[in-house]
Amino acid sequence: MVLIRVLANLLILQLSYAQKSSELVTGGHPCNINEHPFLVLVYHDGYQCGGTLINEEWVLTAAHCDGKKMKLQFGLHSKNEPNKDKQTRVPKEKFFCLSSKNFIKWGKDIMLIRLNRPVNNSTHIAPLSLPSSPPSQNTVCNIMGWGTISPTKEIYPDVPHCANINILDHAVCRAFYPGLLEKSKTLCAGILQGGKDICQGDSGGPLICNGQVQGIVSVGGNPCAEPRVPAIYTKVFDHLDWIKSIIAGNTAATCPL
C-alpha cells in the first residue's frame, strides 16, 4: 500500500544550514548552475522546501511548507559554496487557499509568499513564467530540488538535482491516492517504470513544462520513484486568477472551487 507522505523533510541546521535537509530529486542528475535562477530554498524550524520565484517580490510554494521564522534563499546552487549573488528574504505576507494545517484537500496545497523586499535579478536570480495554458498528457517536464537523491536513504546533495518526467493520465494517480477526485486541480506526473521522482525535501518546488511553472510539488509515494506510483502536483494554471488577483492587491480573492 502506498503511503502518502508530506514531502517536506527535517532540515538539520549547521553553520548557515545543513546539507541533510530537503527532499531531493531521486534518479536525476546535478542541475547546471545556470539552469535554475528561479529556484528558491525555503526553510524554517528544521524543515526545508523548494519554491519558485514568479516575480521580484513573489514566490510560489506548497501550503504545507508554511512555518514560523521562515527564510528564503535566492540564487543558491551549492550549499557549501554559495554564489556571490545569493540573496536572503523573509515573508512579508502569506496567502493560502486553505489553512496550511488543512492542505490535504487535493489541489489546495498552494501558498503565495510576498517578500519583505524585492530581490534583485542577477546572473543566478530570475523569475519563471506562469503558465499560458495547461500541459497536455505526455508532456515532458522538469523537476528539481535539494531533496534526497535516494528513494530509501537520506542522501542529500550539495547542489540541486534535476530530472525529466511526464505528465500522466489522472487515472494513474487516482489508482494510488484515495480521495483524489477526477477533476481535482492537480497534475499527475512521473515515470511509469519508476526510477525518477521527487522525494523528501522537494515539497513546494516547481514542475516546469515548456519553460513555465505548471505544478507545485505536493505529495508522492513512499518510497520514492516506485514503478506506477507518480506524484501529485498542485496545478498552477487552475489558480492563475487567484494568483494574479492577490499580486494585484485584491487580498480577499477566493481560490477556485
From Swiss-Prot:
Residues of the signal peptide: 1-18
The protein's assembly and partners: Monomer.
Species this protein is from: Trimeresurus stejnegeri (Chinese green tree viper)
GO MF terms held by the record: serine-type endopeptidase activity; toxin activity
InterPro entries recorded: Peptidase_S1_PA (IPR009003), Peptidase_S1_PA_chymotrypsin (IPR043504), Peptidase_S1A (IPR001314), Trypsin_dom (IPR001254), TRYPSIN_HIS (IPR018114), TRYPSIN_SER (IPR033116)
Propeptide: 19-24
Family matches, as SMART domains: Tryp_SPc (SM00020)
Glycosylated sites: 120-121
Location of this chain's protein in the cell: Secreted
Cellular component aspect of the GO annotation: extracellular region; secretory granule
Expression across tissues: Expressed by the venom gland.
Gene Ontology biological-process annotations: proteolysis
Family stated for the protein in its record: Belongs to the peptidase S1 family. Snake venom subfamily.
Presence of the UniProt keyword Mitochondrion in the record: no
PANTHER family associated with the record: KALLIKREIN-1, KALLIKREIN-RELATED
Annotated keywords: Disulfide bond, Glycoprotein, Hemostasis impairing toxin, Hydrolase, Protease, Secreted, Serine protease, Signal, Toxin, Zymogen
Protein name from the UniProt record: Snake venom serine protease KN11
Residue stretches making up the Peptidase S1 domain: 25-248
EC numbers: 3.4.21.-
Disulfide cross-links: 31-162, 49-65, 97-255, 141-209, 173-188, 199-224
